[in-house]
């Protein structure tokens, strides 16, 4: 049967490195209530203040990592889409971005016009967060309601602990760990602490007594930090990396609110101060390289680490369009449960 479409969804990117395009993208991204979870008037005011200087700064950062083909995240996501076409046997494989183009609305509308009524929605985020997974699902729901689409959705669940994801990660990273190195840092995207607190159904566990490795299932299901910590620990165990030779941190903090710690920026200085000279960094919250990996870690992070006394920071590529990752991702998508 070829009547079941697969829709891969990643975060998105500005259309270009022009300041106007970056401003438009940031406005759409930051005005999402799942990203900045404040009342609309407060969110609008805050985003308006951010958009005074941030677009120009971000445009410069994007320009430093932009490829001839376009945004690295978009290009790599398209390559993964092509790789998935060799694996998914039930119908077309489409790609959408939560922010920017091609939008979820554009792609779902086209699939509906082509007669597809079964769609597996695959948010490409290993760990759960409202600002990634939930917003993708809610946007799909909004489109279905607004367009009166007759579709059934299976939804890929967070796969931070799934053997397929961990296997793909291990095989992708293994060659990079064959070189001598002092320390491996797993840098995950950060979140405001309040995003975690509000999702703790018990109100008792979040960020208390180092609960990330012992959180009960009901808490773990929606705790981003715990899922990151457990992803990292499972990866290190599979790789046989000794305790003390790897660590976890959280990057990309925005604003003055308290975010989950330790912060990558501070941790880089700490590692250099401890005598780490050759540092390997991987970013397991991202399945495709993007501005947060290439510019924030590969460029700025590497420069900061050297200034702090380190000698070399090597960024390990994300899974990107690795053929083995495509095979494992297909296995995950095959068993995505019917949800919508």
Swiss-Prot record:
Molecular function as annotated in GO: ferrochelatase activity; metal ion binding
CDD domains cross-referenced by the UniProt entry: Ferrochelatase_C, Ferrochelatase_N
Subcellular location: Cytoplasm
Residues involved in Fe cation binding: 189, 292
Known role: Catalyzes the ferrous insertion into protoporphyrin IX.
Listed NCBIfam families: hemH (TIGR00109)
Name recorded for this polypeptide: Ferrochelatase
Native organism: Pseudomonas syringae pv. syringae (strain B728a)
């Amino acid at each position: 049967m070829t009547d079941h479409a697969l829709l891969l969804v990643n975060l998105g990117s500005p259309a270009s490195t022009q300041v106007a395009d970056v401003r438009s993208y940031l406005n759409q991204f930051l005005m999402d209530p799942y990203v900045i979870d404040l009342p609309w008037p407060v969110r609008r005011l805050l985003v308006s203040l951010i958009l005074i200087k941030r677009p120009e700064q971000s445009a410069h950062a994007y320009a430093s990592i932009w490829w001839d083909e376009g945004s690295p995240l978009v290009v790599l996501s398209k390559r993964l889409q092509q790789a998935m076409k060799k694996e998914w046997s039930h119908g077309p494989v489409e790609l959408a971005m939560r922010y920017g183009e091609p939008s979820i609305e554009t792609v779902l509308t086209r699939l509906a016009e082509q007669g597809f009524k079964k769609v597996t929605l695959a948010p490409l985020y290993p760990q759960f967060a409202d600002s990634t997974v939930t917003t993708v699902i809610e946007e799909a729901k909004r489109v279905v309601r607004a367009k009166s689409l007759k579709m059934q959705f299976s939804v890929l669940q967070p796969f931070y602990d799934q053997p397929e994801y961990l296997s793909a990660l291990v095989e992708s990273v293994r060659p990079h760990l064959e070189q001598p190195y002092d320390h491996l840092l797993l840098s995950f995207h950060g979140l405001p602490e309040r995003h975690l607190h509000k999702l703790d159904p018990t109100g008792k566990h979040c960020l208390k007594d180092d609960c990330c490795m012992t959180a009960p299932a009901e808490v773990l299901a929606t705790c981003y930090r715990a899922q990151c910590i457990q992803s990292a620990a499972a990866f290190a165990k599979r790789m046989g990396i000794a305790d003390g030779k790897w660590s976890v941190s959280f990057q990309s903090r925005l604003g003055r609110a308290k975010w989950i710690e330790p912060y990558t920026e501070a941790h880089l200085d700490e590692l250099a101060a401890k005598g780490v000279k050759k540092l390997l960094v991987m970013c397991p919250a991202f399945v495709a390289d993007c501005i947060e990996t290439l510019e924030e870690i590969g460029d700025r992070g590497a420069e900061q680490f050297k200034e702090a006394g380190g000698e070399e920071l090597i960024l390990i590529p994300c899974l990107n369009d690795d053929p083995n990752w495509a095979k494992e991702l297909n296995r995950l998508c095959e068993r995505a449960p019917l949800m919508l």
